[in-house]
Amino acid sequence: MQQFLWYRRAVLGAMAALGARPLTALAEPFTAQADPFALGVASGAPSRDGFVLWTRLVGRGARPLLAGAIPVRYEVAEDEGFHDIVRTGEVRADPQAAHSVHLELAGLRSGRPHHYRFHALGATSPVGRTATVPDQADRLRLALTSCQHWELGWFGAYRDMLAGDPDLIVQVGDYIYETSYPDQPKVRDFGAPEPRDLDGYRARYALYRTDPHLQEAHRRVPWLVTWDDHEVLNDYAALANREGLPPDMFAARRAAAYQAYFEHMPIRPSLWRAMASPRLYRGVDWGELVSLSMLDTRQFRSSPPCAAPTVAHNVRLNHCTERSRPDRTMLGQAQEAWLARRLAAERRPWTLLAQGVFFAPLALDGTGDTVYSDQWDGYAAARSRLLDQLGRPNVRNTLVLSGDVHSFWLNELHQAEDKPPVATEIVTSALAAQSPPPGRFGDVHANNPHIRFSDLNHSGYVRIEIEPKRLGAQFRALDLKSAQAAPSILKQVEHGAV
């Protein structure tokens, strides 16, 4: 089976409300001097018999093309020389989807590497490499990453990531940043104002995709992705936002950001039928070894507790009973019910949940009474419900994968303080973004005995290797101011299966 995205713009009215520029405003005709594949290729959402292949056609300087639908030929082979071609065909790159291609393939042999390429406008794309999931897996190697700010650091960590030969790259949010930080030293410049409409978000993603390290990581490894907040606006919660925009206006901006995200990610188009409220959460099983659930912790959450409705902030536990109200949700009712069903049916030896924000309780001050409401601490009842599900006998060896806080953490997760842990949380630092300001988290270990490790001073990512009876994790730090920096290992974790 194969599908191509025939894009239906469900948000034209919303874009008009934002005063979005027409598609041609920043576009140009294709010329022979332009490389239509300047943004590279990518793959994602692997399954036992398929995956999604991505590319986007652009003009000179990675600007949008001034053109109608463009035919794109594709080839998929089990060998790099394309002697054993297993799929070939033609799809269309539609201008309403920024001439992006999302090719959803199925019916391929499991556990096989595959190579792919596209042909369009007289040019041929780089050759991408991906793989189908094995039926019986004895190992999964993945790289956990988040938070990459174009201006604040180089993306050289991807070079070290690829040296570890991962099966998957799991990106848990802040793939782009919408805003600049003028008080931080820059290594390069956005060259454009903060995006607020579809053209702006498209241009921001196109800029990111010109980075050679990021482009190579997409070319060589399949990705699983979810978003956090900076793909739209810092600390937004559903339609609550820091700028105080009315819900209809922020819904228009969010829909533009979501559309641009989809246009630049190797995501199955079947999850994006309603662009104004797409479904990003989904499950991926790695043979009979790992059950991995990708979660969306932004789109459906309740507003921040005990705050002006637009702003998440520090709250005192004794003064904010709202955070524990049972009707408050981080995932939304539909996603929470979907995850509960998935966990109830769990039978694999390892269970992974990948999501955007800090999950464990985190007391921030000397009294242990202050928490940050943007994290799961602002949604205590929802966290308790999920921990109860993770405590079921059939759910074993659970790992929560998180990002957002620009620092490394290793946390035990308990249903109650006097009970043994039901899961472990690994939090990756930013791949390229500023570290937290001094004192941001206080004396974390004094008031948080469930925290086993933290490093607040380094950027980088986490390598994770899972086998039937073993999990290994390396917290790898790299200097974000150098594209060629060598890694240092901050902590090595070895954990046996139950």
Where are each of the predicted segments found?
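Metal-dependent phosphoester/phosphodiester hydrolase catalytic core
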Residues: 2-20, 26-498
